[in-house]
Amino acid sequence: MKFFALFIYRPVATILLSVAITLCGILGFRMLPVAPLPQVDFPVIMVSASLPSASPETMASSVATPLERSLGRIAGVSEMTSSSSLGSTRIILQFDFDRDINGAARDVQAAINAAQSLLPSGMPSRPTYRKANPSDAPIMILTLTSDTYSQGELYDFASTQLAPTISQIDGVGDVDVGGSSLPAVRVGLNPQALFNQGVSLDDVRTAISNANVRKPQGALEDGTHRWQIQTNDELKTAAEYQPLIIHYNNGGAVRLGDVATVTDSVQDVRNAGMTNAKPAILLMIRKLPEANIIQTVDSIRARLPELQSTIPAAIDLQIAQDRSPTIRASLEEVEQTLIISVALVILVVFLFLRSGRATIIPAVAVPVSLIGTFAAMYLCGFSLNNLSLMALTIATGFVVDDAIVVLENIARHLEAGMKPLQAALQGTREVGFTVLSMSLSLVAVFLPLLLMGGLPGRLLREFAVTLSVAIGISLLVSLTLTPMMCGWMLKASKPREQKRLRGFGRVLVALQQGYGKSLKWVLNHTRLVGVVLLGTIALNIWLYISIPKTFFPEQDTGVLMGGIQADQSISFQAMRGKLQDFMKIIRDDPAVDNVTGFTGGSRVNSGMMFITLKPRDERSETAQQIIDRLRVKLAKEPGANLFLMAVQDIRVGGRQANASYQYTLLSDDLPALREWEPKIRKKLATLPELADVNSDQQDNGAEMNLVYDRDTMARLGIDVQAANSLLNNAFGQRQISTIYQPMNQYKVVMEVDPRYTQDISALEKMFVINNEGKAIPLSYFAKWQPANAPLSVNHQGLSAASTISFNLPTGKSLSDASAAIDRAMTQLGVPSTVRGSFAGTAQVFQETMNSQVILIIAAIATVYIVLGILYESYVHPLTILSTLPSAGVGALLALELFNAPFSLIALIGIMLLIGIVKKNAIMMVDFALEAQRHGNLTPQEAIFQACLLRFRPIMMTTLAALFGALPLVLSGGDGSELRQPLGITIVGGLVMSQLLTLYTTPVVYLFFDRLRLRFSRKPKQAVTE
């Protein structure tokens, strides 16, 4: 009593307290960062190593394996995967959430150093690492195009000037430059001319290497001067290499230009990048795992004018893709939804109380509670994201509930003729415990979420804390500001005011009377109600088992990502043509705004594409509908497949896959893995629950297998090293010398001119100079035949691995796909030597599925404990919790009706319903117990009176929560796919719960009261005050 009086009779202090809360909230709001979702990125580090021209199998055995054995000893590594392709190895380390990425980076560097002695000596550089996840979609893509500069020159500007500067910006984790390679002098040899002149490829390599030397020459001094010695020992352009003498034949000089075509070109000609059909260099920017995407993008944009000024005016630097506009648009939609929810719940109050003065009170209380929450969010290190703003949107219905309960009870006393200040004090005292019970039991729902680990726990933590803080501030406001405003603002109703909205008042009275009549009938047919209650429990179980499930709703971020997978024997020229064909098909789609893509490098039969869709208000289709439409057109392109997927804000794992979900096969028996992977992949491709099934196992690449006759080689005076050096010189784009420039270093690359390598007969033109100086054709001591070879070798941990990726067709859920895959594996009879498991997002979904039921049970148990403590009773909490089955049925039926799978967002809705629907029962039970204690009423009379007395606040609080969630259901635009499942779940649960709990709660109350009396040895008062 004294606590409430302290605030009611000191209005200035109470107002200033509320102002202080509001001001702190405004300051917090201004400093909160913006993000699409809470920070849930796993710490990921990528280790890269290269050995030019080495086969994938060589890279896997000699580079990947030693590194994996060393890196695998690092503490906190949750997953280690590697992929080795032609000349390169990439190892992805994913760490536990609580692992500091900077500390992990130091451990990675130490592990690389420890493995250095086990790596091949011919590696051009030590392995490097980067704190970025290569499987993440870029947060921004910049393109460089020019009508005057070559692709190599554009790449040089991008990698030498732009990429290092961008990498220094806070939040940037990796800048990947694609579309070409660094400038180089390329030497294209003519095998026949070399043979005619008696010059070996090693002779050419040695001559070029010796002619381009950068060594210190020293200085000369006399008594007064010092001269630095400088020579023309370096050759920098193709024109300078052309006249280089590489051999003398019969007294005549053989110059490089006589046996080769020397050009200013690029290090690797098998690279191509495009933007909207125009050749381009791409800078793909990825953020650090812990970085904020909006802040990082804004920082990059702020530096763009400076970056533009560092490159020639003839180079056009453009933003081809930017993730931030759709994120901002989504947050704007949520903010609008929040404002609409606040307006609707205030309208509910106005309709029920029919008083402008009374409506002002929640109109003040709700904003104070919500705005004050921003201060706590800032102190907790949270961000303004879709989930935290959805929490505030839902909180509008909760925070107004507290104000409604207090306000309605005070208004009831005023209508009975009590003076305002007395009514405020008496009304608040009567419902203070009720408000406290409702708030604490609602916060208790989220305690299990705060203890939940892994990605789901990280994802839901901000939602739970934000909502809990809003409820806590609302509790404070409803017991301080609300009664004070009631005491000083409200007056006894006058006849003129009571006539307002008479129609709605009559409807409410009629509803209350009809409810009273129906409740009497129900209380005389309690067995029937018991059957209904048991039926809802059984229906809950059946609906939960049968409803389709997924991890997270499929988002439409306005960005698509596509992986091209072509025939494994395809040439680079044909692959570049496929890229152009696919880009034309996509560019012609009316919903597409921009297309960029690249191919080449170590994976000759693959490429990547990034598609920016038009804004949501300029297209009628969702991203998935656009993918479905394009899939039909793309399937007509022979010899290659383009797998499209919508970029999501949540992507787990470091695998660069061509689809959203992965299923990984592991085996220590590599032949068994290569035998069973095609069988499993083909079986999965036939399943209707899966789409775009593909695999990273690339073991059918075309190979020319050379077999040396070692006896013949020994007789001819040729060793294996000389023969291998010949092949590397001829076909390996061998980097044989370095050109030093002020800003960068460039290479001299030697190989047989592509004009002479158009077919297998090129091997017949190769020869080796033996130890007697004679030219011995390769065909004299080697035979060759075509064979198959892997284009990539993949590991997970230390086991060989193949990952099958898949998307979901429209209308199918991840639970459908998971069950179908499990059935297929059983039907195939896969041996125990090949182990299959879900990976990435699909793995997290499996883990979440296993914990969902436990989480719900834990939430119910926590609420029971809190209510039991508050009521000092084992029984009354069960009465209150009996409201939950009907809410669960309503939520699951609503999801089925809207064809929405049960996701993590829907789980949040179920958790919220546990907190919402019990409020009705709390209000009934509180007043029934009060009537039994002080009114000397029987339990049936007490609960009947409590139901009628609390009918109006029950309707008000339920409609307030309903209208608070309704804008989420009806919202469209960016991010609506996240908001709608939450709204659908809450609205469905509230509607069904309201229809049933008004009748089931009184029946359960009476049932437990009779049960208590039957098993009690002596009568005991139900609740001690």
Curated annotation (Swiss-Prot):
Induction: The mdtABC operon is transcriptionally activated by BaeR.
Entry GO CC: plasma membrane
UniProtKB keywords: Cell inner membrane, Cell membrane, Membrane, Transmembrane, Transmembrane helix, Transport
Keyword Transmembrane in record: yes
Entry's localization field: Cell inner membrane
A molecular function (GO) term: xenobiotic transmembrane transporter activity
Residue ranges crossing the lipid bilayer per the database entry: 3-23, 333-353, 360-380, 387-407, 431-451, 463-483, 528-548, 853-873, 875-895, 897-917, 953-973, 984-1004
Pfam family, one: ACR_tran
Keyword rRNA processing: no
Membrane topology recorded in Swiss-Prot or TrEMBL: Multi-pass membrane protein
Job description of the protein: The MdtABC tripartite complex confers resistance against novobiocin and deoxycholate.
Subunit structure, as described in the record: Part of a tripartite efflux system composed of MdtA, MdtB and MdtC. MdtC forms a heteromultimer with MdtB.
The family this protein is said to belong to: Belongs to the resistance-nodulation-cell division (RND) (TC 2.A.6) family. MdtC subfamily.
Protein name as catalogued: Multidrug resistance protein MdtC
Origin species: Escherichia coli O7:K1 (strain IAI39 / ExPEC)
The organism's taxonomic lineage, starting at the top: Bacteria, Pseudomonadati, Pseudomonadota, Gammaproteobacteria, Enterobacterales
